[in-house]
Every structure is written in structure tokens, then in C-alpha cells.
Amino acid sequence: MALSLWPLLLLLLLLLLLSFAVTLAPTGPHSLDPGLSFLKSLLSTLDQAPQGSLSRSRFFTFLANISSSFEPGRMGEGPVGEPPPLQPPALRLHDFLVTLRGSPDWEPMLGLLGDMLALLGQEQTPRDFLVHQAGVLGGLVEVLLGALVPGGPPTPTQPPCTRDGPSDCVLAADWLPSLLLLLEGTRWQALVQVQPSVDPTNATGLDGREAAPHFLQGLLGLLTPTGELGSKEALWGGLLRTVGAPLYAAFQEGLLRVTHSLQDEVFSILGQPEPDTNGQCQGGNLQQLLLWGVRHNLSWDVQALGFLSGSPPPPPALLHCLSTGVPLPRASQPSAHISPRQRRAITVEALCENHLGPAPPYSISNFSIHLLCQHTKPATPQPHPSTTAICQTAVWYAVSWAPGAQGWLQACHDQFPDEFLDAICSNLSFSALSGSNRRLVKRLCAGLLPPPTSCPEGLPPVPLTPDIFWGCFLENETLWAERLCGEASLQAVPPSNQAWVQHVCQGPTPDVTASPPCHIGPCGERCPDGGSFLVMVCANDTMYEVLVPFWPWLAGQCRISRGGNDTCFLEGLLGPLLPSLPPLGPSPLCLTPGPFLLGMLSQLPRCQSSVPALAHPTRLHYLLRLLTFLLGPGAGGAEAQGMLGRALLLSSLPDNCSFWDAFRPEGRRSVLRTIGEYLEQDEEQPTPSGFEPTVNPSSGISKMELLACFSPVLWDLLQREKSVWALQILVQAYLHMPPENLQQLVLSAEREAAQGFLTLMLQGKLQGKLQVPPSEEQALGRLTALLLQRYPRLTSQLFIDLSPLIPFLAVSDLMRFPPSLLANDSVLAAIRDYSPGMRPEQKEALAKRLLAPELFGEVPAWPQELLWAVLPLLPHLPLENFLQLSPHQIQALEDSWPAAGLGPGHARHVLRSLVNQSVQDGEEQVRRLGPLACFLSPEELQSLVPLSDPTGPVERGLLECAANGTLSPEGRVAYELLGVLRSSGGAVLSPRELRVWAPLFSQLGLRFLQELSEPQLRAMLPVLQGTSVTPAQAVLLLGRLLPRHDLSLEELCSLHLLLPGLSPQTLQAIPRRVLVGACSCLAPELSRLSACQTAALLQTFRVKDGVKNMGTTGAGPAVCIPGQQPIPTTWPDCLLPLLPLKLLQLDSLALLANRRRYWELPWSEQQAQFLWKKMQVPTNLTLRNLQALGTLAGGMSCEFLQQINSMVDFLEVVHMIYQLPTRVRGSLRACIWAELQRRMAMPEPEWTTVGPELNGLDSKLLLDLPIQLMDRLSNESIMLVVELVQRAPEQLLALTPLHQAALAERALQNLAPKETPVSGEVLETLGPLVGFLGTESTRQIPLQILLSHLSFCLGETFATELGWLLLQESVLGKPELWSQDEVEQAGRLVFTLSTEAISLIPREALGPETLERLLEKQQSWEQSRVGQLCRGPQLAAKKAALVAGVVRPAAEDLPEPVPNCADVRGTFPAACSATQIAEMELSDFKDCLTLFAGDPGLGPEEPRAAMGKAKWLWGPPRGFGPEQILQLGRLLIGLGDQELQELILVDWGVLSTLGQIDGWSSTQLRIVVSSFLRQSGRHVSHLDFVHLTALGYTLCGLRPEELQHISSWEFSQAALFLGTLHLQCSEEQLEFLAHLFVLPGGFGPISNWGPEIFTEIGTIAAGIPDLALSALLRGQIQGVTPLAISVIPPPKFAVVFSPIQLSSLASAQAVAVTPEQMAFLSPEQRRAVAWAQHEGKESPEQQGRSTAWGLQDWSRPSWSLVLTISFLGHLL
């Protein structure tokens, strides 16, 4: 029976669709003119078409015609006689497809196929189908009729379809116009009328073996290069290259449309989890994660995921029905209780007879039935195939995936058991079967082969017969597999059986035809066909000979494997559609097309049963998978493959069955890899108007959404894959999340998922593969603590399990473990193991738990075993408890103490029990003490082992103590070490030996350094710290080590620590190009430069070719040429934040043109404000544009904020400002809160849209909350602030004292309401806030608990109250009764006592050693980062009272003791009187000169006495060199007037040393300035900004009439540096200085100044005239620095500022108002200052008083505040 053309046409349409992969959505109805009659004509024509007509090629007839027209010798000739009649049109399918390719009518054709599938799925009625597709069908009929029927429809009036033609074209029936249009635009054109001139029967068709070359030469000449002429293949190649150009574009465009439509459709089906208003998100599944990735442009590796595997798809659900539509059981799931012998016998005859009748109770594909029953309806005189032969060759059905295979097996087993035994049971490899077929064959063969009477116990018998094998193997498969597959067994198997026996043991040998493994998914078992058809049919002669007579197409299919033509049988069909592709030979299309293509077509038109409606993505998924299988790997290029894979992935997501059928288990690792790469990347997207961001802000939002919604999915993937790399990336992403978002993420996850992720982190940490930088360890602890919250109970075992992560936990989280934790020996062992990584505060918290009486009792009763078990915690016991350890207890741990890390007090207690000075083995004792020797006094060291050898072991050990900070370089032991070094001389030490002395480098005198060689000095540089080199040493060393010629970048960078030694001479020796290159290595040292050194560095870049860069409005003709244009300066990036505004103004345009480069620089407040104005930022700038500005956005004006209309946008901008690394300036902060209150008081606030944004506000904003709003904050918001303070305490210290106290009280109220006892846990939570509690709150805290939580700054009020509490009897008692133990217990808290109380402490309790330790501890605190930020009170008087018993005589009638250098180091230089300094030995003074010069507490007489000693050392002052002047420092104040005049002050280096000294008398100021002008020969008008900066404090030595001659241009630049000084100028001098700013070259009229100008000029603003100050606006006032506020003379301050102006001060400005200024203010003015200090909240003493002076204008109604507080309650 000939194949009908109708199913074949459908197949071709399907292939056509899949080749282009465009959407199946119908494009809408077309014209109905052709009518439905065309459909009938089409069907009748197809049925009546003679089969022989298909062997003719109308297209090659056309080629013959057009080629003959170009044939040589016939070009231009007319026809000879009458032309022969045209042959009847013949249609070849590839001709038809070539015509349609690129046509806009592809869309209607694809719509036709989509509707056809919908019709079969009963989603459309036949009427709807015909209505929608009548136009398409009509156009198709026109083409077919024109090709098949002579004299068909006339030529259409509409233009034919081309790849670039109009959209209203029709399907062309004439090949020539179509081809000419397809070739349009090339370099040739047809010049003659084309007529047929030869008999077309002579033209060879596509299948012909011999072509007529003379027919093709003309066309080949047009399409191919000359060298390629002569073959039909060259013709096709040229044609495809010409017309195939748009194919890939159309292919990709279609896929793109499919992907876009699928995204929305799949999204509507699956949905997408999103964070709610609280930041929580219900976790999505893996399909939703993949969809999220597609929507956010993640590049999933679809090949690795399994969606481009190239395997044939499973039969679509649409095609599973048979003719009657009765639901049938799956053949792969037989009833377990029916044995093979009990199954009903199935005859082949009955199978064929019932094919059209009732459905049989088994599933056999129609194609299988058709193939088997061919003998019943023979179409050719070929002999009938033998059913026996069919069953003998049924192997390929057994290994095929087709459902009919099982029916075949059952039928052959029942009818031909012998053949079945031979063909299947005896010769088939057991492992080659699919899973379901393997089970069936196992049962069928077991029924045919009776088990042998006895299976051999040892090796299998020889020969091994199939009967014995199957019987024994099926009886005990595992046992026989072991016996059969042994090496000895395999050798015993006969050669005839070795192949299949080995196959059973090892599985099939891998080759191109090997079947891929079966995959069990949610849809059951899938066993893709991997080439078995080719093996079992083409390679099997019997089956091939039986089947080929009935199916001739198999001959073409099997050509490759049978050694024939290597052309795929479908290549002729698809070749025109697939240009530039590799040969189709290896593709699955050539290997196994039959089982699924013909099987599908045999079922497609017969499906009439009720098929459930299928979603469009499901239908499309099947077609896309079929396309992937047909095209083979790599079709369309990488880009097209990626798009195809994305479409496949999307279409599979809604259907669990399709998704898990394709998804590979190993795809999980690919998902993790893609997510990890996405989390690591920073997306860059430029934005319009030049505001280009370097990082896309939406990327951060998307990553946050990904982590919030899909973390449980990622955790599950991690648990399965154990990807340490992905775990590292994911943990890093969590560590960078805002704490509140991370908390919501963890709390919204399932408990088991969170616990599983914590286990993963623990495993990564144990394996050492989870690495976290120190800066993120705190964040890791926060993440660990959040995950711990998902455990219902924290047990000791959990502590042990998580011990590797314990060092990262906060103390408050650590305290959540039960108090009985330390009673567990395993817990103590874990603490010992991980104590090196634990922080001191963690150990302190655990050590305090040791003191619970119910655990171990009192400290003196602790046994040795317990002491050893808790040894890591002992150094962190409170000192008063540690002192309870007895000598016996201490000596029991003698060998363990050196490595315990004891502090000074603890160490001294241990040393008292371990050191025996009466024995002779002093050196051995010191050796055993190890690091504890650092706490020995000089006297103890001298008695045990005198220091004498600079390279000795004891000396090296002490130097190690100095290196790690245990030993102070300024202490007495260090002085003894320095004596050893000086006595031996540094020149005798090698560079390596000298390097160990680097910790004491700052104490080495200049003369000692001068004696060292250059190699020795260079050897020490790498080990020096920046602060260990004094400025005088830096000047000396830089002058010696800096090459004067050919200085390289590497050489300069190696000297970066010496940059503070910059002098005019060294700066001149450094080429500017080297300075520019060294910017990155010098940047860390720039903050250590003096103001004058910074100015000189900037001046270096202002001078080009000897010409200084001046402004156009310079100060005068001496320095500026009228009309001169400023010369652009190229500034190194590291210097830009140091530029004065005047210099920044010159180059602002060049900077802003390249602002993307500078968006991360730490611009100052005034620089950011200035550049913001210069940018002229439009009001409609988006948040993304603002983020692109980086730190420049910190200069945002209040007006810009006020013009933001949307509340949501306003909050987003505020959030962005608080995320900047630079601190929010005071005026902008005040503007934010004022604007926020105004918006919240509006009649209709945008409450409906504000909610989600409020939850994202940063806790930094809450920390900055005005005091007046703090009382109404929610408890959750307060806790967010407390957590921020614990993480970043420096942010707390940036607040005013009033703000700190208000926040501390509010936090305590939240944690422990009134009448509630305050526990240690509460104070642990408060952390740094404890030291700012008020008096009443402090007295409510148990004192012992309070004293153990005072490791941070102490507010003035708190410190005063604490000092009173320390003197209570229950604590330390009266000071006059103190002993050394009480002093050691008090530690640095002794300075909280009053001066009177300190003076009462007995002398015996304050020995030299105790004093030295106490003062060292206080000095170490003051020099620490936190101590410098704390801004503690001046302690000079208290320190003097503390050391009075040592430095003062015991009785008034006794002379003062003469101190030596050791005494000075044991106390402090200011403790010595002028008499004592004068009487010191010269050598002692020389050794302590650096200490005297650096002590700012010296009175006016002491410097004079010290300078008397210095002159004895160095001679008269006129001989002092720059290094000596720098070393003397403040001692120069002690010079007499004549001596001061003799100092050499020629260059700015020496001048700046004197300019930095505060405390000169007015006479001395005048002498210094006069001497400099006289010696340098300069006039005041010629002073540039470097020398003006160098003058510093001495600028006030110029008279008013001299000040007016200063260049306003130069002074405006120096204002940045001079404005930071509290100049001792008179009011008249300050007014003259301030007047310079309004002159030409300055900043212009004061009324035009912005706040940035007031910030720039600093304290010089105090000289602005009264009237000008009185006229300042709110914004201008807020630019005045707090220091400038404090230096305004009190009478002037009271006159110029009104109460309204004073109330507009920022809180930091109001706090700077001095008591002297307050004394001059009126009551209304004082209330205004108090209002500003409390940020709008009345101070306690002002509550209830009237505010009639006008503050109502600056406040808000009470109901407005209620709204504001309500808004702030939503901040969580």
C-alpha cells in the first residue's frame, strides 16, 4: 500500500516548524476568499496524484532552463522555432520547502500546525479550526494545485513571498520569480527571458547518478567561484549560501519570540515567590528558581541540566491513544500475581484481525501492528515475510523503547517458544534490555527454561549451556553474577559464549550505538533509544532482508552501516533547510527515525478519544525536544543552541513529568555553579545623561530576592552535591546582607533546612574549606547565631558539635547556652581546642560563669584537674577572683602559665608565687617564665639575670614582648634594654640582628641613628610600623636614604613609612611622575603628613614648567596676569580628597567629566557639597543615577531632597545616603528628619505604598534618630540600633553626649523596664551603651555586675557616678585604706575617682611598679582607636595627684628628689617640676628628651628648664638643624626672645614646626614671623598658600595692617588648613583674615556663600563681622564648624545670634557652645541652645517653661509627632 501524502505532509510541516522553532500561536484569521472548497480540492488532488510524478523534478527542469540560457554560445540567441511544450508540473517536496523558506507565510503555516494540535487535543472545534485557518489552507492549495494540476489557478495578483518581501505576499507557485527575488541584491541579474529549450526528461533529478554538466555551467558561474564549477553539490552550496543567510537569524528570532511568550505564560502558571512587607519570603521550588533565573538573565547551562541531551523525547501525552480511545493499562506494569504461563495466548493472526476491532488488553504500537501484519495486505508481489523470521529477529523490539516491544515479546514467546528461546533467552545480553523489558524477559525465559536439578556450588560447568545459565542465574542472580564474572570463570567459558557472558558481567562495550542508561523519574522509567534500530535492523541480514521489500526507505537508512552511500535518507529532504550544517550522518535523525516518527504519524490521524486539554508549554516542550533530537548536537551554532535550550527549559517547568524526565541529577551542581557565578559578579549598565553607575543597583536587589526566596532550595542542592565552592560563595553573600534581611531569611526558612545549612557550614569549617576574612568574622557569627535560633533547645552536645563556629558568636548568643554548660568535660575540652580563635570578651563571659557557686564552689577550693581543664579561661577571670588563687594552685600549673596569655595584674600575681630571687638559677627561671618575664620589674630582672648582651636570649625574649605590645617602649624595662644597645653600639650588629630592635626604634636618638650604616637602616624599614618612627627620625632617614638622582617608583614606595619626613629638599628630589605613580603606596601615609607637608605636596602639582596655576581672579599683579586662564591640573586620585575648594574649583569641570572614576573617593563634606552644585543635578534623577555618584551623593542639598515628590522615593534616597561610607553631615541629617516630619504630617501620607520600603531602612538611620523621637521607637527598632552599636561602636561615638545618653536610657528601658532587676545578660546586650547610662540607672545595677562590663568609653556623668560607687564599703572602701591589691583591682578606673580621693591613697599602695603598670594601661587606652574616639576628660590633675607620693618629697621641709630617666619613664614627664628637670643628669635628660618634647602637659616653666638642658647638649639655638628643631617640639617655647630670633627659619619645613606649636606668647609670635620674613626676604603679599599654612599658629604674629596685604587667592587655599586651628589671634586680626575671603580671588560676598564655604574656612569664620553673622540663613549657619562656634568671643556670640538662629544649630554645633558663651546669653537664647542640643526636645530643666520667643516656627504640632512616631514604628 502506497503511503498517503497527507500524513507525510504533516510530518514535513512539523519538521519545518522545528527547523525554525518559532511560536505556535495562531496569527489570526486570514482572508476567506479561497473558501473551504480548496481543502476538498487539496485532498482529492493528493489522493489522485500519480506516484510516478514524484520522480520528476520540476525544479531541475527549471535549472535546466535557466542554465541553458546562460550556456556559452547561446547567450542572447532567440528561440529557434516553436518552443517545445512544457512538461506537466511535477512537485518535489524539497522544492516546495525551498520556496517557502524565509517566507512571511511561515507564521500562518505554524499557526496551522498549532491549531491542528489544538484540534486533536479537543481545544478547538472543527468549525473554529476551519474559520481560523481557511486563508492559510487556501493559499496552500493554490501552490499545490499550481504545481500538480496542469492549467491550475491563475498567477496570484499579490506579490510572491520572499525573505525580504512585503508581509501581504502569497505562497508562490512559480519558481523563477521566487528565486530571482531571493537572489535580489546580488551582482548579477537575468538578462534574457527564460524559456525551456531542452527536453526536461533528459535533465537528471536529484536522485540521478549522472548529472548533465552543460546544463549547470551557466548557473554555477553565477553562484560559485570559478574554481568550484562542475558539480551539482557546488550548485547547491552556492544556492544555500546565497539564500540561506537569513535562516539562522530567523531561527534565532523565532526562538526569541518563543522564549519571551513562554516566560510570561510559565510565570502565570508557576508564579514567583516574593518577599512580603516584613522581608519574609515563602521559599520556592527548583522550577521556580530556574524560572527566576531566566527572568533575571542568568545563563543556565541547559546542556548540563539535561535539556539539550539529544535523546528522543518520550511519546507525547497527546499521542497515547489508540483507535477506540478506551483507556488501556500500561504494558510495562503487568499484574504481579499473574505468571507468564497464565497469560492468555496471543496469536499473530488474531492480532492482525482485531486491529480494527475492539482494542486488545495490551499495548502494541500501530506501527508494530502494521509491520507485523504486512502479509495480510500485500502492496507488492514480494513474498510474505515469515512470522517465524519476525520473531527470530524481534531483538530490536526487546531493546527498543517502544511500548509495543512487550506485546511482541509476549506474542513470540507464546506462539514460537523455540524461536523465542534461541533468539532471546540464549543470545541476548541481559543487561542490554530496558528495565521493564528486562523484568518481562526474566519471567518469560524462566518459564521456558526449567531450573536445573542442581546449580553447581563452585565454578559454572563447562560448557555453560543457556539452560544452566538462565535457570541458575534467574534463581539467584546475585550469587551467580559473582561466580560467573570471576576471572577464572570467564576463562572457562567456551569462546562461542564468551562474548555474551562478558557482556552480562561488564555491561555493553561503549560505542556510538550504545544505549544510554534508563532514568527513573516522576513519569516512570525512561530508556532512551541509543541506536539499537541501526544495530538490530541494518546490521542483521535476516531482519534487513525481511523488511526492506516492504519498506524501501530502509535501504537509504541503512546505507551508512551497510557500507553503501553515506548519505542519510532524510538528507535529501532536509538538506535545503539546513545550510552550513555538518553532515547528518551521526545525528539521531539518521540513526533512529523510524520508531517514533512513523509511530507518531500512524497514531496522529486516528486519535479520536477524549484527550485532556494540554497546556501550550507542554505541547511546545514536546516539539522543541523533537527538534533538538532531529537536528542533532550543535545545530544552529552555540547561540541558537543556548536559545533553544532556554526555550526547552521554560516549556518543561509547568509540567513536573516533563521537567524531571529531562533534568539530570548531576544538573544540581550546574545550578549551584550558575548561582555562585551570579552572586560573585557585579553587573555594569550605563545610564543616560552621563550619570553612569559602575554597579547596577537592581543587581543587589535581585540577589537579595534570590537569597530571601530560594535559600532553602540552594541549601538542599548543597546537601546533595557537597559543593564547597558554592557554599563559600553563598556564605559570603549572606555575610554581606543587611542584618535585618538576613534575620528574616533565616526565620522564614523551615527549621530542618536551617539546621541542615548550619551543618554544612560546620563541615566546611572542619575541612578548612570555608574561609572567612577577619573583617567578616562578626557577620559569620551573626549568621551562626540566627541559625542556632532554629534549634528549640541549646544543649551541651550542640555546643560541642558546633565548637568550630563558636569563636564567631557574639557574647549574647554564647550566653544563650545553659549555665550548666561548663560542667561538661567535653565542653571544656572543646573550649581548650578552639580557645586560640575565641575573642577575649567571649572568654570573659565564660570565665564569669565559672564563678557560679553551684558549679565548682569558691575559687580557693578549685582542684588541679579543674584548673587545668579551664586554663584558657583563667586569664579572663575578674582580677579580684584571680587574686584568690593560692600559691599552691598557681605552682601546680607552673608550666602552663607562660602560654596562657595573662594580663599585667594576673601575671604579677602569678610571678609572686613562681619567682624566687634568692636562688642562683635566675637565668633558668627567666627562661621558664617565657612571656611572663615581660612583667618583671627592672629590679627583679637585675637580681635574676642582668641585661648585657644585645643578642642574648633574655634580651630577645623581652624584645618580642615589646613587639607584641606587652612591653611599653617608653617603660623602664625598655629603657634598660636601650642601655644595653647603646653601650654595645649599634654599628657592631648585623642588619638581621638589628631588625629585632625595631619595636624600640622610636626611642633611639638621632645620634644613634646617624651612626648606623645605610644597609642597617634599610634592613629595619620593612619591620617598622608607621607610628614607631618620630617625625624627626623620618626627616633624618628620608634625607639619608632618598636617592638624589634617578629615583624609581619602587625605591620611593620602599620608603613610604618615611613620608612624614618630607622636607623642601626631599620633595624637590622626587620627580612628579614618580609621585603620581606612587600614589597607591603613599596613600596610607598621607593622613600622617602635617598640614604644611600636604600643602607642599599639592603645590608640586600646581607648578608646571615653572608656571604656577593661578585663578583668573588672582590677588594682584604680582602673582597673576590679568585675563590669564587657569591651567588644568592632573591630580593623582589619592590627593583629590585633600584639595582645598579653590583648587577644586579650578579643575571641577575636568573632574566632573570623568566622575565615574572618582565615585569611591572619600570626599570631604565641603568638597561633596561643592561638586554637587557644580554637577547641577536634575531633580528627576533616578535612584540608580544617584547611586552611580557614589560618595559625591553625600553632597546632596536639602533642596534636592525637598523636591522628591514620592514618599517611597524619598525613603529610598535617604536609605542610600546612610549606606555611603562617608558620614552624613549634620545639616543634611537635620534636613532629612525635618523633611520626614513634614511629610508625615501631610493630610494624606502615602501609607499604602510606604510599608515595604520602611522595612528596608538601615539601622544607621535609626541610630541617627533625633532625641525627641527616640522615646516612641518600637522595641524591635531599638534592638536593631543596639545590635548596630555592638557591631560598630565607633558610630555611637560620633553622636553627641546627650544623644548617647538618651539612646542608652531608651535601650535599658526596653531590656529591663523599671522595677526589673538588671542582669549581666542585659549589660552584655547593651555593650558599649553601658558607659553612657545616667545616675539613676547606674545605681539600679548590681555593682559587681556593672564592674565586669566597663570595657568601653565612659560618659562624664557615668564616670563621676562610678567613682562614687567604687568607694563604697561593699566594693573597694575608703581610699585611705587601700592596699596594692585594691589599686590593681581598680585599674584605670582609679581615674574615675575625684582628685581629692586619689590624693588620699597611701604611698605604700602606689609603688613605682604599680604606678608604671597603671599609667601604662591608661596611656595604652588613650592611644587605642576607641580611646582616641572617646574624648575623655583631661586627667592631668588626677595623674599628678596619683604620682605625688613618688615625685614629691615625703615632707615639706625636704628637698625634691632628683629623677633619673627611669623615674620619668615610670611616671610621666609633666610630673617633674622645672627644678627637678634642671637638676637632672645630662645623660638622663638626653635619654628622655623625646618624652619631654612630646608631653603637652608641661607648664610654662618646665620648657624653659628643658631648653637649658638642650643647649648644654647641642650648643646655642642658632646652630640647631631641622631635625633637632623638630625633635625639640614644644620645648622651643622655652627659648628666650633673642635665642628665638637666632633660629634659622628659611624654608617651610622648619617654619611649619614652629607653626604647629600652640602656646606661644604674643611677643614670641611676632618674633617668629618677623624672623622668617627677614631671613627669607619675602614680603607678606608674596606669601603663597604653602608658607601661609606653614605659619600656622604664628600667623597671629602679623599686625592687622600686614594681614590686609596677604593674597586673598593664596589665603583662600590655605583656609582649609588654618581653619582647623584655634588661632590665638585678637578679634581685630580675625576680622582682617575673614575680610580676605570677600576680596577678589576669595569666595565673594558672604551672602552668596554656601554652607561648604563656612565649613572650609573653619575657625576663621569667627572673624566675620557682626552684621554679616546676624544675617546668616539657616543653611549657612549649619555649615559653621563646631570648633568655629566655640572660638567666637562670648560677647560677640551673644550679640550676633538670635534665638531663632541658635535653635537652628545642629546638635553637634549646639553642644560646642562653651560655658563662657552661655553665660553671656539671654534666657531665651539659652533655651534655644538647649532646644538645639536636645534636637527639639526640651531639656529637663526647661520642661514646663514657655517658648514664646518663637521656637514654634521650628517645631511641629504634637499630632504631627504622633504620626512620625507611628511611622517609625514601622521601621521593622
Swiss-Prot record:
Keyword Glycoprotein annotated: yes
GO biological-process terms attached to the record: cell-matrix adhesion
tRNA processing listed as a keyword: no
Signal peptide: 1-25
A Pfam cross-reference name: Stereocilin
Record key words, sorted: Glycoprotein, Secreted, Signal
Residues of this chain annotated as glycosylated in UniProt: N65, N427, N476, N565
Subcellular location: Secreted
One cellular-component annotation, GO: kinocilium
Family designation: Belongs to the stereocilin family.
Name under which the protein is recorded: Putative stereocilin-like protein
Annotated source species: Homo sapiens
